[in-house]
A protein has these predicted regions:
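Hydrophobic residues within the alpha-helices of tandem HEAT/HEAT-like
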Residues: 67, 81-89, 108-109, 120-131, ...
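Alpha-solenoid helical repeat architecture
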Residues: 67-73, 108-112, 150-154, 194, ...
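Long alpha-helical repeat scaffolds
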Residues: 309-637
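N-terminal "cap/leader" segments of large eukaryotic alpha-helical scaffolds
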Residues: 1-83
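HEAT/HEAT-like alpha-solenoid repeats
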Residues: 53-64, 89-109, 134-150, 175-198, ...
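Boundary/linker elements of alpha-helical solenoid repeat scaffolds
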Residues: 35-50, 79-92, 121-133, 167-176, ...
Length: 637
């Protein structure tokens, strides 16, 4: 210890000796004459840029790594950078990294933070909008997997936000693509979101769930939210199976060129399987899946309606009940559409027969009552006024027009051959349709489309059986429809007037319906009005086709009206345009289609009106082509 003490003293003494001394000049200057080389890692350390708001913009690899970062702020910044890059038109450089990009963005659907989930959905929306469906196809299973995980998550908040992710897919992904990839799986997840499997001896295999932590009203709204998205998914299935009819092959005769026509008719293929041909009960895989959908969904839909349905003494619906009825009726209609498409493809009626046998009476009791006393439904006036657009899309408005018209169509599907004891029920439905026609001027184009669809169900599809029990009300409805069409009360938007025209023409073409409804006496106003359509600036392809069919059937009322308007029609041919015609078709070819109508109408020309018209046209040099063709049509034997 003593030695150490002396050593410390000497050290202290040495410090004292140096105190006040100065270093020689130049020894305290930093040397700067050495050389250095800059270290560069080109792939990792790129120059960072800043946006106009002063936020840092990262390179692609840094962004992809930050999408998986544990910090919410880092993940949110990465999502924002991806959106900014896509909006600036730099989507091409992402093509090679789409797998990592979709993994990172779709994983945000399971994030515990709500803000991060919403940022993820915004980024997914921008990304799907920027990419072509072909580029998304190899990675769509990644998005669908995270969507299904979110829909079945244990946290209600993540389940609820999964509907926002589905909204993005419904908006940005083509319906056929979405239906083909994962619609069937998503439908199962939808059912799990509002119900659970039942483990008792009840006939129904699922029961509705109630979220006790949020109250009954919130549960009703939650189910409505889920069912609206389910309706959109089923709509994609219906749309994807709707076949588009191609244009027919048109061959024009020319004397100086060889003509080639089909000699043999195409062989009609029987697409039925062996079980259907032998009348054995055997569903295909698609039919079995559809059977499962209906078996699980219909009881849930009816139970959901029974929970919010008002008592018999209070027929008015509150807003939640009206919205619930709106989506329930829409879903049931879509299920019927899927069944009809399946049965048309496979030439069978097994599913529809099973559906009517098991659910027709339940539908009648729950939605109409046996005598139709619960129908029609109306909504209570709202205390606070909302925009008409919001009311119309959510609950159908105070008159509940979409719901009531949907119930009319569903009743016709469940009871295609009504019996005499249902006379009061169907008279009630027809009376409601008559009242709706009287309010036609106040209906939107969408409501008029729904009205025409319900008219088709009553006046055409089920008319043969309905004429046996409600002949007089149904005939009055037809007369009101003809009067509304002739007076041009149906809007031309969304093709409403054209659909009414097609419906009336199809009724005329059916000889049994034409006779039962009163024949010429009933349809004279409509048939006499038809030639006036050719005097308008445009005429639809379907309208011209319907006129041709009426001429082929030698309908004398229509041909007489056509002959009477011949001078005006032929003088108007140069200004006439046919909509939805074959692309690139010559204008004269369309004019010839109108002139061909007089090949049939000439049999009523006892006064030689057409021949005088031909002579007048021959005097006009610029119309010689029309005159020659009309002369050939009139003189052809």
């Amino acid at each position: 210890m003593g030695g150490h003490h002396k050593k410390n003293l000497r050290a202290e003494k040495a410090k004292v000796k140096l105190k006040g001394a100065k270093l020689p000049k130049g020894l305290n200057v930093t040397k700067t004459d050495f050389k250095v080389r800059k270290i560069e890692i080109r792939e990792q350390l790129k120059e960072s840029s800043y946006s106009e708001t002063g936020q840092r913009q990262f390179n692609l690899k840094e962004t992809l790594s930050r999408l998986k970062h544990h910090s919410v702020k880092f993940r949110t910044d990465a999502q924002r950078n991806v959106r900014d890059s896509l909006k600036s038109g730099n989507a091409d450089h992402l093509i090679g990294h789409l797998n990592e990009l979709f993994q990172g963005i779709a994983a945000g659907a399971l994030d515990m933070e709500r803000s991060a989930r919403q940022e993820s959905f915004k980024t997914l929306d921008v990304l799907l909008e920027a990419l072509q469906p072909q580029a998304v196809a190899p990675f769509f299973h990644v998005i669908a997997t995270y969507l299904r995980c979110a829909m079945t998550h244990v946290l209600p908040a993540i389940q609820e936000d999964s509907l926002l992710m589905l909204d993005v897919l419904l908006l940005r992904v083509p319906p056929a693509f979405l239906a083909e990839r994962s619609a069937s799986t998503i439908i199962g997840n939808f059912i799990d979101m509002i119900s659970r499997a039942r483990h008792d001896n009840e006939r129904s295999n699922r029961t509705l769930t109630l979220n006790l932590s949020q109250g009954k009203q919130t549960t009703v709204k939650w189910r409505t939210k889920v069912l609206i998205r389910l309706q959109q998914i089923l709509g994609t299935l219906v749309t994807s199976k709707t076949a588009s009819t191609g244009a027919a092959r048109v061959v024009h005769f020319e004397e100086m060129r060889p003509q080639y026509y089909n000699v043999l008719c195409p062989v009609r293929q029987d697409n039925r399987d062996l079980h259907t041909i032998l009348n054995e009960s055997k569903l295909t895989a698609e039919g079995t899946q559809l059977h499962t959908y209906v078996e699980q969904l219909l009881p849930l839909l009816q139970d959901n309606w029974m929970e919010v349905r008002p008592q018999q003494q209070q027929p008015l619906l509150n807003q939640d009940a009206a919205a619930s009825l709106h989506v329930v009726i829409g879903l049931m209609s879509l299920l019927w559409n899927l069944i009809e498409q399946h049965e048309a493809d496979h030439s069978t009626t097994e599913l529809s027969d099973w559906l009517r046998k098991n659910y027709a009476q339940k539908f009648l009791l729950n939605f109409l009552a046996k005598d139709g006393s619960r129908f029609p439904y109306q909504q209570m006036p709202l205390a606070t006024k909302k925009s008409s657009k919001e009311k119309g899309t959510v609950d159908g408005g105070e008159l509940c027009m979409p719901q009531n018209l949907g119930i009319v169509r569903l009743t016709c599907k469940f009871f295609p051959s009504p019996v005499e004891r249902q006379t009061q029920l169907f008279a009630h439905l027809v009376g409601y349709m008559q009242e709706s026609l009287n309010r036609l001027h106040s209906l939107s184009p969408e409501q008029q489309l729904s009205l025409v669809a319900s008219m088709r169900a009553l006046l055409f599809e089920n008319a043969t059986s309905l004429m046996k029990i409600v002949a007089e009300p149904l005939t009055s409805l037809l007369s009101a429809s003809i009067e509304a069409y002739v007076s041009q009360r149906f809007t031309t938007r969304e093709g409403v007037a054209t659909r009414v025209l097609n419906l009336l023409c199809e009724i005329v073409e059916r000889s049994d319906l034409y006779t039962r409804f009163g024949g010429e006496q009933r349809f004279t106003p409509f048939l006499s009005y038809l030639p006036q359509l050719v005097l308008k600036p445009t005429v639809g392809e379907s309208t011209l086709r319907a006129m041709t069919t009426l001429c082929r059937h030698l309908n004398t009322v229509f041909m007489a009206a056509l002959l009477q308007s011949a001078p005006e029609i032929i003088n108007h041919l140069d200004k006439l345009q046919i909509t939805n015609d074959i692309e690139g078709q010559d204008k004269f070819e369309n004019q010839k289609r109108v002139l061909n109508l007089y090949y049939y109408a000439r049999v009523l020309d006892k006064e030689g009106k057409l021949e005088r018209l031909v002579k007048q046209l021959e005097e006009q040099v610029e119309r010689k082509r029309i005159a020659d063709y009309l002369k050939a049509v009139v003189g052809y034997h």
